[in-house]
Swiss-Prot record:
Membership in a protein family: Belongs to the p35 lipoprotein family.
Entry-linked InterPro entries: Lipoprotein_p35 (IPR011653)
Keywords per UniProt: Cell membrane, Lipoprotein, Membrane, Palmitate, Signal
Domain of life: Bacteria
N-palmitoyl cysteine lipid sites: 31
Disordered: region residues: 33-59
Protein name listed in UniProt: Lipoprotein p33
Signal peptide from the UniProt entry: 1-30
Chain residues carrying a lipid of type S-diacylglycerol cysteine: 31
Topology with respect to the bilayer: Lipid-anchor
Main location per the UniProt record: membrane
Gene Ontology CC annotation, any one: plasma membrane
Pfam families, per the entry: MpPF1
Length: 376
């Protein structure tokens, strides 16, 4: 489902560019952060060194690319591992990636990569003030009769510069209703002018944001859980500021200091490959257990009106694997079991979407499902 977008963010209520409160920790702050790692440069320092540049003592001045477009895991821009004060903000994570992969950011990055002792700071002008306030996801999602929907794979990706920006793009009832309609949250008799965003963001499965939407229908409040896969979000920062602190190697090569270099930074969040196996036990006729499409139909994965084809959104919502096109491979009974099957499918990212590893090639996925067998 990805690289057109309003498209982000395991790790993911958020603040700043990526900061979720309560169920999701803070991701970014308005201040710059520094990567103090030493790098992986050439350790030859003259004397017995064999590198020609080391003997000449070249000093490289970082030259940033005007546009940087990358794709990959959410963890590259949102700390999905640490919590609380140990959680790194988005500035820090981008700075670390620049130091580790300077060739992606600088025209002379291959040269910089060979030098030790320089460091990077980044300023994305991320707003640290959270606008997602109110009840935590764990509370509002537990309200009785909450209607759930997930942003369809056919909907456009969303370009945002922060989670505050995501909310600002949903600043009218008309815009909120439109995105709800695209997520199977359609209520024909609801007051079209009553749609509002409420409470904190939620984040589950490492790849699904949850937005609380309310509307009025027949005098009563509708409570909705709008899910947006993070792979539908693109982080786009105009004039991302990058500064480099010089190295001070007494022998060999060095990197010169530069301040406030700017680039237009775009990050396409990749699709997480993990699947969540279904827990329900649908009915399956014993006579159908050898037919893969009938097994998948029993799981509710086929298209309405055409049971020979899979419905991408139905499969995605069940397995938690979003923005892919699915094809059936096999449904094989588990050895020694009467009611358990190993299901294999092929999944390929839709146009403009990629896996977390940056590729968009077809991959095989598998999971087990248990059925209630019927008939003789």
């Amino acid at each position: 489902m990805k690289i057109k977008k309003i498209k982000l963010l395991k790790a993911l209520a958020l603040t700043g560019a990526f900061g979720i409160v309560a169920t999701v920790p803070v991701i970014v702050s308005s201040c710059s952060s520094t990567d103090n790692n030493g790098g992986t440069g050439d350790n030859n320092t003259g004397g017995g060194g064999s590198g020609t540049d080391q003997q000449q003592g070249t000093t490289y001045t970082p030259a940033i690319k005007s546009d940087v477009t990358l794709s990959g895991a959410l963890s590259k821009i949102y700390d999905t591992t640490n919590t609380g004060d140990s959680r790194k903000n988005t500035n820090t994570l981008i700075a670390e990636d620049i130091k580790a992969n300077p060739e992606n950011y600088f025209t002379n990055g291959e040269d910089l990569k060979k030098v030790e002792g320089w460091s990077v700071t980044v300023d994305g002008s991320f707003d640290s003030n959270s606008v997602w306030t109110g009840d935590a996801y764990s509370k509002w999602s537990a309200v009785a009769d909450t209607h759930k929907g997930v942003y369809k794979s056919t909907s456009k990706q969303l370009n945002i510069n922060s989670l505050k920006d995501l909310k600002s793009q949903l600043d009218t009832s008309a815009k909120i209703k439109a995105i709800c309609d695209e997520s199977n949250l359609v209520f024909s008799t609801a007051d079209a002018d009553s749609y509002k965003i409420q409470n904190e963001l939620g984040f589950t499965g490492g790849d699904l944001l949850h937005i609380n939407v309310t509307a009025t229908q027949a005098g009563k409040t509708l409570n909705m859980d709008l899910g947006i896969p993070v792979s539908d979000l693109n982080l786009k920062i105009t004039d991302l500021k990058v500064s480099v602190t010089a190295s001070n190697n007494s022998t060999g090569n060095n990197v010169a200091a530069v301040s406030d270099l700017t680039t237009n930074f775009t990050y396409n969040i990749g699709i997480k490959e993990e699947v969540t196996a279904p827990t329900e036990k649908p009915n399956l006729a014993k006579t159908d257990k050898g037919e893969v499409m009938k097994v998948l139909k029993a799981l509710g994965y086929t298209q309405t009106g055409d049971e020979t084809k899979l419905d991408n959104d139905k499969v995605s919502n069940s397995l938690g694997l979003y923005n892919c096109e699915f094809t059936a491979v096999s449904a094989t009974p588990v050895e020694g079991s009467e009611d358990k099957f190993t299901i294999k499918l092929k999944a390929k990212p839709l146009t403009d979407y990629v896996w977390e590893d940056g590729t968009n090639t077809e991959k095989e996925i598998s999971f087990e499902a248990t059925f209630t067998m019927t008939g003789n």
